[in-house]
Structure formats: C-alpha cells, structure tokens
Amino acid sequence: MVLKCLECDKLLSSIEMAEFHSTKTSHDQFEETEEEIKKRSPEELKQAIEALREKAKEKKEKERILALEEKKTNYKILQKSNDETAQAMRKMQDQARLRDLQKIRQQKAEDAEQRKKILAEIERDKKRRAAERENKNSSVKETAAPIKQPKNANSSSTCTRTPPTSGRFSIRHDGQVCNITIAAEETLRQLAQQVAEKMNVSPPTKFTTTFPRASYGTDVFDKPVNQLDLFPSAVLIPQW
C-alpha cells in the first residue's frame, strides 16, 4: 500500500510512515495511490543522509544559540535581582543605623536633661538646708540668755544640734517628680508604699541615687531612714 499526502504530495510506504509524517508535519490528508515510490540510488541516499545530518547539525546549533541566549538573559535577570536585593539590604541597614543613632542622641539628651534636673534639685536642697541652719542659728542666738559665772571660776558652754525629725525625698520616675516627707523613724518600705500610692505604681523594690551613686535594696528596707546615708534629704529613683 502506498499513501500520498495531499498537502505536500509525499509518497509514504505504510500507515505507520503516514502517522509519523503527520506527527512531524501536522498534515492529516492522505489517500491511496497507484504511484510507486521511486527507489533512490546509493548516491541519492548518501545525499539525503548528508542533508539530514546538516539539518540536524543546524537544528542543534540553533538550539545551542537559543540556550546560550536564554542563559545570558537569565543571568542578567538574576544579576539585576541580586543588585536590587543588595541595594534594598543596604537601604535597610542605613535606615537601621540612622534609627540607632537617633535613639542614642535622644538618650543622651534625656540623660543630660535628667542630670540637669537632679543638679538643680541638689542645689535647691543645699540652699534650703543652709536657710534652715541660718534660721536655727538665729533662733538660738535670740533665745539664749547670758549666764554669769563667779570670778576665777572655770566656765564651759556646749551647743547641741538637734537632729532632724523628718526626711524629705524627691522621687523621680518616668518624667514625674513627687516630693515625700516622712518621719525619721519610718523605713524605706513605708516610703516605697507612699511612692506606690502617690504615683499610682506598684511599690518599688529598690531606690538609687545619682550623686553620689548608691543603691538601696530590700535588705535595708526595714531600717529607719535616719540610719541611712541618704537622710535627711535625697533625690531618689525608684526601680522594680
């Protein structure tokens, strides 16, 4: 049986060859024919084989060039993506460093402002204590009566300073200032309770001073404040 492709006039020796031809060319119009398939001479077969080889070689070269171009394109896309990713990473790092720098500057400014406030409070406390001493000395001079001693008798006089009966503490927390006065016999625990009530926080478990730097934990919370070196007045920072 010989089949002829009506679309390209090619003669095919079997149904299988027609199916193969249809697969390669998408031709689907065939009919039986009485024509005979001309047998090729050895030279024609050789030329046909050589032509097929050339076509296969050309096809392979085209595929190689296409693959190379595709590889170049993919490399450019990848390189561009990597550049964009690296640029985005650098931008994020720069922004993070800028935020850190701003935080450091803000913290330094807040520390300087806090130090300024504490120094001002210490200066006010010094002036207040100096004024209290001046008033006390003036009162002693005004109320002291002269004592006459017999001639040739040894005389002596003593002046006893009355210890403070209360402590005055300036509590600094989160931008708030709370001044609390407690009796000299009261403890740091009682002071902590007053801090909690007046500043609407939980009772602190520790107090610190900045000038001079010192800390007072729960191990001294039950001691009277007049037994601690922060008496009679101090600027305290509560901690939890």
Curated annotation (Swiss-Prot):
Region of interest called Disordered, as start-end residue ranges on this chain: 21-43, 120-171
Q: Which domain of life is it from?
A: Eukaryota
Q: Does the keyword Cytoplasm apply?
A: no
Query: What GO terms in the biological process aspect are recorded for it?
Result: negative regulation of proteasomal ubiquitin-dependent protein catabolic process; negative regulation of protein K48-linked deubiquitination; negative regulation of protein ubiquitination
Instruction: Cite the Gene3D superfamilies for this sequence.
Output: Phosphatidylinositol 3-kinase Catalytic Subunit, Chain A, domain 1
Does the keyword field hold Zinc?
yes
Compositionally biased tracts (Low complexity): 155-166
Q: Could you name the Gene Ontology cellular component terms for this entry? A: cytoplasm; cytosol; nucleus
Chain ranges passing through the membrane: none
Q: Which UniProt keywords apply?
A: Metal-binding, Zinc, Zinc-finger
- The stretches annotated as zinc fingers (C2H2-type) lie at 3-27
Basic and acidic residues: compositionally biased ranges = 120-136
**Molecular function (Gene Ontology), one example:** zinc ion binding
* PANTHER family, per database record: UBX DOMAIN-CONTAINING PROTEIN 1 (PTHR46340:SF1)
Q: What is this protein called?
A: Uncharacterized protein C17C9.11c
Query: What is the protein's species of origin?
Result: Schizosaccharomyces pombe (strain 972 / ATCC 24843) (Fission yeast)
